[in-house]
Each structure stands twice: as structure tokens, then as C-alpha cells.
Amino acid sequence: MRVAQSWLTEIIERTNAGWSVTPEELDAGFVRVGLEVEEVDRLERVGGDIERPLVVGRVAEITELTEFKKPIRFCKVDVGAPELQEIICGARNFAVGDLVVVVLPGGVLPGGFRITSRKTYGHVSNGMICSVAELGIGKDHSGILVLEPGTAEPGTDANELLGLDDTVIELNITPDRGYCFSVRGLARELACGFDLEYLDPAVRTLPEDAAEAWPITIEPASQCTRFAARRVTGIDPNAVSPWWLQRRLLLSGVRPISPAVDVTNYVMLELGQPLHAFDAAKLSGGLVVRTAKPGEKLRTLDDTERTLDAEDVVIADDSGAVSLAGIMGGASTEVGEGTTDVLLEAATWNPLLVYRTARRHKLVSEAGKRYERVVDPEINVAALDRAATLLAEIAGGTVEPVLSDVRVPTPAPEPIRMDIDLPDRVAGVAYPTGTAARRLAQIGCHVEVSVDEESGHGQLVVTPPSWRPDLAQPADLVEEVLRLEGLEQIPSVVPTAPAGRGLTPEQRRRRAVSRALAFAGGVEVPPPVFLPAGVFDTWGLDADDPRRTTTRVLNPLDVERAELATTLLPGLLEVAQRNISRGARDLTLYGIAQVVLPTGDTKPVAPLPVDRRPTDEQIAELLGSLPDQPVHVAAVLTGRREPRGPWGPGRQAEAADAFALVDAVADAAGVVIERRPAAYLPWHPGRCAELVVEGRVVGYAGELHPAVLERSGLPARTCALELDLDALPLRESRPVPVVSPFPAVLQDVSVSVSKSVAAAAVESALRSGGGELLEDIALFDVYEGAQAGEGRKSLTYALRFRAPDRTLTEDEASAARDAAVAAAADAVGAVLRG
């Protein structure tokens, strides 16, 4: 937000006469109360080697020069001198008699641009008629600055008139400080920072009226809690906003348009309450606040026809939607050149609905920015009074003695009880007596002092102001006191480090797994902890799939990502897609992180105290209410697993590569992971294996489903794995394998099995039948041709036999091989091939 220093000073000076600060002190004051200053922009006076380089002029004559490629005007301007000043100008938004701002020869504009007399377009131009951009007040180059009639006489020093000795402060208002999106809020923060009195400008200035300004109905589905309206009639459609108002708008980055629009923008900047002005003559019937009808259309003020969503909230009359609630008005009721009757509206909208509507329509507005951050629900009528009074003063209208103010009952904020010395204990600072109560009163809280009946300690009973819904518990109040007293007062004490105990077994296992995946060519990425909206619908999961049971965050950073992840794959796939969209093709990404799995015992709990150790019962209740949070490991493989080069064309990643990563995880964790065929989305049902440890399914691996990949924007044949690391048995120590000094006997065996039998099942059967002499087994050939037989395949394994205490004979090895084949025949129907 941009705001002029003079505007802030004006509000604070109402109760602190003569108060002034330098721009540097103002910058430091904002930073001291926790606001982020983006830029301090000092306006520059027009200087030069003449007494008055910048003056007010009145246009006396205009001659149109038509012999050039673009329209040019030869103007004679009265600048208070005996003779008219002749000036060439290309702008066309002024007429004879208008007051303009002129830089005379010898003047120097901001940026060091010197004005001189020079011949151009066949005439000598003695000066320049200025736009607000050339003066450094705004960014509008489309026309020159035209002052309101009667503003000043020709020859008046325009440096003083335009206030070019001001400073503009630009601040970055974070989402939790929505009340600072106004001069009212910023001035209050400054008053707190400099410990000054503050008088709130948001006050009612017009008498209460029983009559209704306009019929208004609020439908419950709109979630609008307040809608107020005032009417101003008989305004002059040709009126122009005075310079003081235009100047403040320009310095705030808002372009002046007309008195009705300028006043609503001005009051929004001043008080933080967005307003909208309807041309009352264009409204038909009463106003209804409702959700949009399916397929309903609205042409907004940016001249874009929008197809509305059923979740959009609109203001409608008998003809249909006339405004997109909280974001932008409609073109059909726009205040125009002939408007004489204006209906001013101020409402309180649901921030979440405004946020979603703005994102849905890709429509950003100053009103929407404020509603998304919460607007004070108690200043609607005060803002209407201010706007109506200003509009009547500027445009000569009459404020009708009627007011519509429809409210939906909402619960009042609950008082917060806080020990008086809680800020002292948290900060480790002995603040002067009464500091907490004084600081909380400064930010607008209602503060009472009481005594706790149980402990006998003094307490503050604090009711937060309407514009601070973020104050909900004692910790929030402590933060405010510490912030305003100065964080630099808190002593910097380094806590004593506990004696080192080394890594836990779980931490060692996690590191070992991470190293194993990195050695296998993987790149570790931190998986997002929140699920993308609609990801399980993209996968096609059943409605009762356990992964759909998620934990929602009450106040998420992004409303589209409010659910904690029950699986790491969505985040990893999203990271992979983002890298692929930026040119990466061959990826092996992995992540190790906790997932959140709600259970039937998961339930909300009361906040724990921050000023003392919670009781054992409170800790037990908290731990018992938490969802399960096991550590998962997941990986995604896409593109080539082996790069192409002079040695060959390379090799595409396939399910076997995902299984190889599973083996790497198993080896690092010191467990044996078996693989069994499975059908589990988002994996391909024919190329997916469930991962089993000691009879328990701990994860899945294989190639992802083609439909899921297409909907996710990922290449075909992308593979993935995910398994529950905490479900693996924790091996404190591993048995050291016995290394036999005797030679091994190598034999190959080919068996024929049904195509439906998994190779892993055959391997398991061979391993069990081979007994202790079978040291290793590896599949090295798969044949599914005609000679294998219909519906069958041939698998060839390399078997390695070795005895720890003797040299095996060929007969002993053959007997062990035959036993392995017999076990496979019993288990999976394998037939030995010759």
C-alpha cells in the first residue's frame, strides 16, 4: 500500500498538535511496530535558475495544427505575466479556460530534465504543460493535469499548491495485518510506535434514520453479515474532484475518474472499508445479496463478460446480477457522465468466498485485497457517512436522510483473560506497571482488571476490537505487547545445550535410506505437506478410500491446499511435473517425510498454555487426539534411467527400476521386502507390486496408471514407489554374514509357469526350496514366445550354491537345485524345462 506522509501526519496531528517526523523516522517507526516498508519515495520540487519555475496557468487560446502526423496544439497560456506564454502540447484533454500546470524555461523537472525555449512544429515553445507523471505525482501519461476551476490564480507557485515536498511510503501489508490496509490502521500503528494519542476517524457523522434508503434482502447462502446503503441525489454530473483529493489518490496509486468513484476510493484508502457506487436510476427493484445462478452472466466494470459460478456471491436487482460481491461492480449500473442519483453501498463479505471468486475469475481489485484480509465489520455506516458527506460537498448533491443497514446476527468476540505479568514472564523483561493494559488499549482493545479467584493473581480481561479477529488467546495479546514495547528489549540469551546423545535408531535408518536412494541416482526434494485440491479425483480413487480421509488446517496459507498429505506421491508428482515443464526430462526424485493419517480418536483439543508447563492430563489429551504421523519414503522415476550416448540409445525407466529402489531401501533398513502383484491406484494394475515385510503390506511400487499420468501432465511409463518407513522392523544390529572360503557352484534353471504368476513368487519358492545352500538367486531371462506354450512363460534363473564348511560336490548342488524346483512346482505350478 502507498500512502503520503502528509495524510498520516494529518490524522495523528488531530490529537498531537505540531507532531512531525522525518521520512527516515517514519520508516523506522513502521519497522519498529512490525510493518515491512518496501520504498520511501520523496517527491521532488521542480527547481531551476528562475524564481518560480512551476506555476499555474490558464489556457487562453488553442490553435489546432493539422499538418503533422499526430494532433498537435499551439497554446497561449496566461501564467501571470504581462504576455501570454506560447507552448506546444500534444495532449487533448483540456480546453480554453482550463487551469493547468506549466514549467517555464529554466525549470528542471524531477529526474533532471531541463526545460528550455525551443522551436518545434514550426513554433517556439516557451515551456511545457505538465502531466502528473512528469511531475512525479502519478503514472498517468495519457493527458495533462487539469485543476479544478478556482483552485488558484495564474502565476501561483505550483510547487506549493501541488505539495511537491511530500514523501510517499510504500508498505507490504501481510495477510494477517489487514487492518493496516488503510490510513486509519497505519496511523494507529504509528501512534502506538511513537506512544501518541490516537483519535479514530471512523465515526458516524450523520444522524440515525429509520427510513430505508433502498430495499435490501440478504440470502443466507451468501454468507454476507452486513449490507448498508445511503443515497445521494442531485449531484452535478460535470463536477470535478478537488485537487487535494485527486492528489492523495494519485500518490496512493489510484487514478482519479469522477467525484462518485473518487470518493469511494478515497474512503476505502482512508478507513479501509471498500465501497461501491451504483447509478440509482439504472437499478430496477430492490437489491438481493445471493449466490449466482448456474450460467448467469455479468459484465464487470473492466468491460469483461463473465460466466458466474454457483459459488460466486452477487448483488442483484430485478434484472439480474449487477455486482460481483466484494470484488468489482457491474457495467449495467456504472456511474457515468450523466449520473445524478447515486446509491452508495458498504458490505461485509466472507473473506474466503471473496478469495475464491477472485482466483476463479482471475480478477484482482483493491476491494478484493481488503476483503480477503478481513474488513472491520463495524465501520460500514461510518464509511457511508463519510463518503456521502464528501460527495455532497464536491458534487453539490443532497444526502438523503435515509439509511438501509441490514445485519445478520453474529456472535460477539469472547473476552480473553490473561495474567497481568504474562508478557513479562514470556519476554524475560520486567516491564513497568500497567504496560500491558496501556499497550492493549492503544491497539483498540477494551481492557478491564480483575483477580483470578483460584490463584489470586491479577488478570486483564481483554475484549479485542472488531478489526482484530486475529486476537484469540493470551499468546496473541502477549505478542502485541512485546511488539509495541520493542523486540530489541528482549534479552538475547543462548540456551544451554543439552549433552549430545547422538542420533536415534529411527534417525540413523532414515539417513541410511536417504543415502541409499541418493547413491542409486535419486535427488532428494522436500515433498509438499499439503495436498493439491482434487488430486484424488484426478487419480480416480473410490469415495471410501482411506487416503481421502484427511486433516484440514483451520487457517491455511493457501485455501486450495488446506488438507495435510496422507501420501507423499501427489507432492512428488507435482514437483516432477514442474521440473518437466521447465525442460528437465530424465528424473529420479525421492522424498522422506511424515504423512498425517486421521483415526477415529482424532479430535480438536483446547490450546495448551504457553506461560507454564501443561499438566500431564493436558499432554495426554493432546497426544491422544493427534492423528497418526508415520514417516514415508516415496520416489518418482521418469524419462531415461540410462542415458543415451556412443554406447547405445539409453534405456527408459520401467517398473523394474522402481523395484530396484525398493531393494535399495530394504538393504539400507536391514529388512527383506517381498513383492506381490497388486492393483492399487495410482499404479498400473498389471505393473504394480505390493511391498510386504513379515506378512504386512508396507507400500507399493511399479508403473503409474496411464490415465493418471495423462491427467497429471506427466510422461507415459512414469514409475513410482511409496512405503511406510516406520512400519519396517527396526534393526538395532544386523547379523554379520558368514563369508565362506570355499568355492561356489553355479547352475541355471528354466521353469515354465502361467503368465499370471509373478516372477517374485517363483523366486520366493525357489529360495525356500534351495535351503541354506542356496546363497543367491537372480532372474536373467523371460521368454513368452510360441514355444513357451499358450498362456505360459519361461523364466530362467541363475542359482549360486555354496557351503560354509566344505566344497560342494556337483551332486549336492544338483540335489539342492532339484529341491528348489520341486518347491516351485508345489507353490506355483512350475514345470522344469529341458
UniProtKB/Swiss-Prot annotation:
GO BP field: phenylalanyl-tRNA aminoacylation
Protein name (database record): Phenylalanine--tRNA ligase beta subunit
Species of origin: Nocardia farcinica (strain IFM 10152)
Gene responsible for this protein: pheT
The protein's assembly and partners: Tetramer of two alpha and two beta subunits.
Enzyme class: ligase
FDX-ACB domain location: 740-833
Family: Belongs to the phenylalanyl-tRNA synthetase beta subunit family. Type 1 subfamily.
Alphabetical list of CDD domains matching this protein: PheRS_beta_core, tRNA_bind_bactPheRS
